[in-house]
């Protein structure tokens, strides 16, 4: 299934289209780094080494081994990520810093937002696996610091360093599968690294309960420590088939040398060119913008008084100014902007970026306090609430597998994106209906299943459309942009949900239960669940309060889901083929064919 047509290498120099002039094509060739040329050479070996047939589909043996290793790596790093996310609460609590968990999550989101594009650019220059090893070093150092630190500041630093490595794994896995797969199989291939979510969703909770808790307060250190061993071993399994393919390519004389600098360049010139290649100034401006805008949202936490404090206002104002400077830099001065200028006129990329942001934002608003709502308003246990809250990730991954297989035989990704976007609105509507215990937990579970299926139909098929709109040279960079926007949507959604929750819930509880009890329940709702079981008068008032706030959250989520459904109609409905990427001529032919279709076919994408 994961068969790539290597004729794309000849198509990169195509100069026959109107839109992509001879100058543009020469720029593409010029910008093809030694890392990308090495990637192409290794991919050819991976595809041509040997093959076998199963289920009527031809598979490359070495490529299949690499993808199986990628699956194992995804299982180990995914499990480590889920466990780290859970035990950081226990770790912070052991240092008496439980209230700082929100700040940790915000900084992690910012890190994940800003490192994706630099990782993509560096991997284009030096190679995917070479960059993967660099990410592994950061990940392992972060895990070691987190496991051994005697202070909370050390824990914070370790978690942030670990996030630098983990975010690299996510980007590089997607870029690697993009290198190895044709567009028709891209949706399925991109999900290989995330398929283990299907398993980890159900086992991570049991592992967390065994390495964290009150019985052994510092046992959480093992939750970090064991992955200092597991992840490097799984990485070795991933590296071996790729390095073997590199060796075969080198032995045949087809592996280009890795150029760290051009002939005649000084060290200073080399470093300056490297800074230009990864758009270092843009990265710094983008990072500062996110920190100064998103961090105040977390610090203020929706409390009106804090929004009026000088340092909050100053951070937001300065952040907004830096955001404006960042836009000017990207449009006027950056030699290698985040969005390559050759694609500035392509609506598919902008619509996809906006959809990625809007869908994740609306989804995070719904998910942010779902565990608390399940325990307070539905009477679910901690383990049950955690598993229900993970249904989205589970169903999204399952749906990605099915959609990925279907796209191999029906190569029209936009159809699935449109269907998923409309289904997402229906799912959010069901969540609005089934939001308290009186409506039944089965209804809420059903609604979460619908939303999860919708997410699986939207994300990777939409990414496939974006990949069809770009060349291989820019594929990793555009993927990094999509990942960055995803994380920004996640952070903004959490901030909006926190603002609504903080400003409205306390007032509701105080109005219904009085100042003393209302504030006590607001601060620690889980401490009162056994004292006031479902059916008691106090619990009834708690359920009514939480139901009212959940209603507001779902209304906001529905609004964003509806906006996402409108946006999906503006994507270009490319028909994808077995090539790694479309040539400029093929893209222009596809655009012309789409223009000649009826308006209904253009909107739906079939």
Swiss-Prot record:
Topological domains annotated Lumenal: 162-187, 246-279, 332-337, 382-390, 433-435, 502-550
Signal peptide: none
Regions of this protein lying in the Cytoplasmic compartment: 1-140, 209-224, 301-310, 359-360, 411-414, 457-480, 572-606
Cystine crosslinks: none
Protein family membership: Belongs to the major facilitator superfamily.
Protein topology in the membrane: Multi-pass membrane protein
CDD domains in the cross-refs: MFS_ARN_like
Source species of the chain: Saccharomyces cerevisiae (strain ATCC 204508 / S288c) (Baker's yeast)
InterPro entries to which the protein is assigned, alphabetical: MFS, MFS_dom, MFS_trans_sf
Entry protein name: Siderophore iron transporter ENB1
Aminoacyl-tRNA synthetase as UniProt keyword: no
Stretches that traverse the bilayer: 141-161, 188-208, 225-245, 280-300, 311-331, 338-358, 361-381, 391-410, 415-432, 436-456, 481-501, 551-571
Superkingdom: Eukaryota
Gene Ontology CC annotations of this record: cell periphery; cellular bud membrane; endosome; endosome membrane; fungal-type vacuole; plasma membrane; vacuolar membrane
GO molecular-function terms, A-Z: ferric-enterobactin transmembrane transporter activity; siderophore-iron transmembrane transporter activity
Subcellular location per the Swiss-Prot or TrEMBL entry: Endosome membrane
Function: Involved in the transport of siderophore enterobactin and so has a role in iron homeostasis.
Database matches in Pfam families: MFS_1
Alphabetical list of SUPFAM superfamilies matching this protein: MFS general substrate transporter (SSF103473)
Keyword vocabulary terms for this entry: Endosome, Ion transport, Iron, Iron transport, Membrane, Transmembrane, Transmembrane helix, Transport
GO BP terms, alphabetized: ferric-enterobactin import into cell; intracellular iron ion homeostasis; transmembrane transport
């Amino acid at each position: 299934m994961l068969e790539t047509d290597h004729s794309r290498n000849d198509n990169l120099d195509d100069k026959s289209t109107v839109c992509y002039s001879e100058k543009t094509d020469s720029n593409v060739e010029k910008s093809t780094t030694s890392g990308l040329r090495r990637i192409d050479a290794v991919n050819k070996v991976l595809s041509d080494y040997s093959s076998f047939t199963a289920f009527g589909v031809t598979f490359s043996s070495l490529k299949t081994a690499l993808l199986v290793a990628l699956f194992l790596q995804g299982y180990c790093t995914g499990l480590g990520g889920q466990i780290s996310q859970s035990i950081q609460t226990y770790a912070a609590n052991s240092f008496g810093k439980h209230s700082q968990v929100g700040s940790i999550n915000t900084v992690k989101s910012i890190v994940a937002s800003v490192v994706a594009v630099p990782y993509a650019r560096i991997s284009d220059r030096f190679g995917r696996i070479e960059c993967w090893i660099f990410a592994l070093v950061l990940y392992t150092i972060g895990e070691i610091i987190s496991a051994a630190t005697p202070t909370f500041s050390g824990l914070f630093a370790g978690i942030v360093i670990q996030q630098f490595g983990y975010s690299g794994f996510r980007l590089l896995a997607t870029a690697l599968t993009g290198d190895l797969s044709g567009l028709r199989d891209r949706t399925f291939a991109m999900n290989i690294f995330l398929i283990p979510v299907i398993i980890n969703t159900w086992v991570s909770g049991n592992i967390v309960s065994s390495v964290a808790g009150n019985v052994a307060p510092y046992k959480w250190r093992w939750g970090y420590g064991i992955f200092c061993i597991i992840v490097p071993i799984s990485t070795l399994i991933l590296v071996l088939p790729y390095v073997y393919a590199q060796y075969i390519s080198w032995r045949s004389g087809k592996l280009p040398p890795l150029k760290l600098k051009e002939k005649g360049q000084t060290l200073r010139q080399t470093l300056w060119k490297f800074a230009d290649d990864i758009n270092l100034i843009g990265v710094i401006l983008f990072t500062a913008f996110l920190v100064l805008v998103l961090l105040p949202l977390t610090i203020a936490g929706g409390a009106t008084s804090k929004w009026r404090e000088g340092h909050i206002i100053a951070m937001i104002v300065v952040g907004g100014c830096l955001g404006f400077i960042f836009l000017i830099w990207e449009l006027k001065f950056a030699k290698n902007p985040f969005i390559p200028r050759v694609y500035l006129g392509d609506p598919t990329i902008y619509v996809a970026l906006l959809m990625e942001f809007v869908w994740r934002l609306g989804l995070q608003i719904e998910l942010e306090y779902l565990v608390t709502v399940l325990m307070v308003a539905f009477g679910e246990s901690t383990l049950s609430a955690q598993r229900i809250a993970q249904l989205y990730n589970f169903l999204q991954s399952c749906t990605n597998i099915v959609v990925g297989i279907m796209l191999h035989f029906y190569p029209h990704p936009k159809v699935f994106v449109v269907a998923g976007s409309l289904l997402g609105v229906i799912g959010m509507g069901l969540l609005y209906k089934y939001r308290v215990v009186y409506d039944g937990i089965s209804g809420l579970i059903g609604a979460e299943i619908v939303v999860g299926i919708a997410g699986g139909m939207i994300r990777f098929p939409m990414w496939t459309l974006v990949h069809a709109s770009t060349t291989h040279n820019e594929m990793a960079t555009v993927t990094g942009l999509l990942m960055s926007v995803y994380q920004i949507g996640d952070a903004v959604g959490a901030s909006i949900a926190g603002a609504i929750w903080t400003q409205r819930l306390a007032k509701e509880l105080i109005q219904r239960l009085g100042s003393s009890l209302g504030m006590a329940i607001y601060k620690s709702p889980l401490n009162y669940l056994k004292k006031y079981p479902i059916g008691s008068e106090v619990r009834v008032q708690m359920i009514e309060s939480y139901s009212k706030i959940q209603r507001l959250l779902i209304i906001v989520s529905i609004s964003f889901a509806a906006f996402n459904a409108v946006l999906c109609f503006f994507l270009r409905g490319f028909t994808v083929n077995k090539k790694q990427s479309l040539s400029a001529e093929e893209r222009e032919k596809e655009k012309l064919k789409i223009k000649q279709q009826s308006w209904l076919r253009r909107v739906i994408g079939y």
